[in-house]
Each structure stands twice: as structure tokens, then as C-alpha cells.
A protein has these predicted regions:
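Extracytosolic ligand-binding ectodomains
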Residues: 1-144
Length: 144
């Protein structure tokens, strides 16, 4: 991954059309109703698109809301741990799942190529391919 895919960092990418990389979020890539709503509201309130910190915070909030619904509001640590292990939930990126073995949030990634669009002050990550979470062999390194 190229790292640093926050909007201010993408300004420098405008110098590198055709550069390829990977990201876990760019507001124009996920095609789902949750992302559409978040992007629309973010533009309305802030007059700019959300970056991956916004999507990450939104995803964390969705995880908590989903867990509390599934636990009937029981917010005790042990109940939430059991509830969230293996739990899937909707996010701006699409479905995420907490892997039971190590609590890793398994999520899709995006292979992109930078294109230049005069409407944006930054190099635009254009989707080449969505890499499904199931395709990635993320090791489990804990001894649980």
C-alpha cells in the first residue's frame, strides 16, 4: 500500500499520474447506500468529501451500534466481546467482519491507479479492482 491516502497527501499524487497503490478507503470507490449517505452528508456539512479517518470512525460506530442491538443493549465487556467475535456489520466500505480468533476487522481493499481530474486538487485514486477480504491471507499470530 502507498499509505497516506488522506486527502491532503493525495495532493502530492497529482504529480504521479498512473501510479498504482492500495487503499482501504477513498470516498469515490465503495458503491453502497451507507457510503452514499455518509459522503452526501459530509459534503453538505463540511463542503468537502470524507477521508479514511471519517470512514474509520463511522465504521467503529456501526460496530458498536450493531453489537448493542445484537446484545439487546447489554454493554458489559464480556457480552460485547462474545457478541462481536465473528460479527459482520455494514460500513461505508461495505461489510466488515471481526475475525473471532484475533478480533481483526476483515475488510475489502482497493487497488487504484492515480488519474488527474481538474475538478480535484489531488490525484484521484481510480478503482482498478476491489480486493475482497476473503482473497487476502492475513495471518493469525496470537496464541489464543
Amino acid at each position: 500500500a502507498t499509505g497516506g491516502n488522506i486527502l491532503p497527501a493525495l495532493v502530492a499524487y497529482k504529480q504521479f499520474p498512473g501510479m498504482e497503490g492500495a487503499a482501504y478507503y477513498y470516498f469515490g470507490m465503495p458503491k453502497n447506500t451507507v457510503n452514499d449517505a455518509m459522503v452526501s452528508r459530509h459534503y453538505t456539512q463540511f463542503k468537502s468529501p470524507p477521508d479514511f479517518f471519517t470512514a474509520g470512525g463511522f465504521s467503529a460506530a456501526m460496530a458498536v451500534v450493531t453489537a448493542l442491538k445484537k446484545s439487546n443493549g447489554d454493554a458489559s465487556a464480556n457480552t460485547l466481546i462474545k457478541t462481536m467475535e465473528g460479527m459482520s456489520f455494514d460500513t461505508p466500505k461495505g461489510k466488515m467482519t471481526f475475525r473471532k480468533e484475533d478480533h481483526q476487522a476483515m475488510q475489502n481493499m482497493y487497488h487504484f491507479k492515480i488519474k488527474i481530474d481538474p475538478a480535484f486538487a489531488w490525484g484521484v485514486p481510480e478503482l482498478v479492482r476491489e480486493i475482497k477480504a476473503e482473497e487476502m491471507q492475513i495471518p493469525i499470530r496470537n496464541k489464543r
